[in-house]
């Protein structure tokens, strides 16, 4: 598997879609959410390679799908989230399975991994500035086009080769290390998921979903 450090987003900075995020709000959603804390303790806070989106106009995402990362969709795990200045940083480790291997190979091939919040939130006006206030942070996914300019990989990937033993046979994950710079444009999407509170929305920070 491949491990690297990243920024997930920044705070109190106007993003490319003219919105702000509050650091205390986001950090509180991480520290005070029993689900996220449990997932972090078990190394099980996973994200997907792109946000979950309907594949047809008529298709709708269920609340269960929005709030969960199915095992077959796991691309990476988020570890050691931390505040660094006005940014949320974390360590990323590629997941096992086909999707995780694909994610890791893209990073090895030179793609700079990008990250984007998946959250239930409300929009508020703070001294004339539009702030996204999270009610529940679900995870961070890795789209091609995130909305926060800083939300990208910040270190070269480190490959870990771990023995896999089955009966009397053993093998190693085939992972190489390399990284090149890239600049990714971004855009933010708000998709209403039909909560009783019309101001409550699903935040998916991605481009042209």
Language model features with spans:
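Intrinsically disordered, low-complexity terminal/linker regions enriched in Pro/Ser/Gly
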Residues: 126, 152-209
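Signature of dsDNA virion morphogenesis modules
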Residues: 1-167
């Amino acid at each position: 598997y491949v491990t690297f450090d990243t920024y997930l987003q920044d705070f109190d900075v106007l993003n490319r879609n003219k919105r702000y995020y509050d650091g205390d709000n986001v950090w509180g959603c991480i520290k005070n959410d029993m689900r996220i804390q449990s997932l972090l303790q078990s190394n099980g806070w996973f994200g997907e390679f792109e946000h979950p989106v309907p594949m047809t106009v008529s298709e709708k995402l269920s609340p269960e799908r929005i709030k969960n990362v199915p095992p077959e969709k796991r691309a990476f795990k988020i570890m050691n989230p931390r505040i660094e200045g006005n940014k949320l940083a974390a360590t990323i480790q590629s997941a096992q399975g086909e999707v995780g291997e694909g994610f890791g190979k893209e990073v090895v091939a030179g793609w700079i991994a990008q990250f984007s919040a998946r959250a239930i939130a409300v929009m508020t006006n703070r001294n004339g500035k539009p702030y996204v206030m999270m009610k529940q942070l679900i995870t961070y996914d890795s789209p091609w086009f995130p909305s926060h300019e800083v939300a990208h990989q910040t270190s070269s990937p480190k490959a870990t080769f771990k023995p896999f033993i089955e009966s009397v046979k053993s093998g190693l994950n085939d992972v190489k290390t390399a990284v090149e710079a890239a600049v990714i444009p971004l855009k933010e999407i708000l998709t209403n998921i039909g909560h009783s509170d019309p101001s409550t929305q699903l935040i998916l920070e991605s481009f042209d979903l």
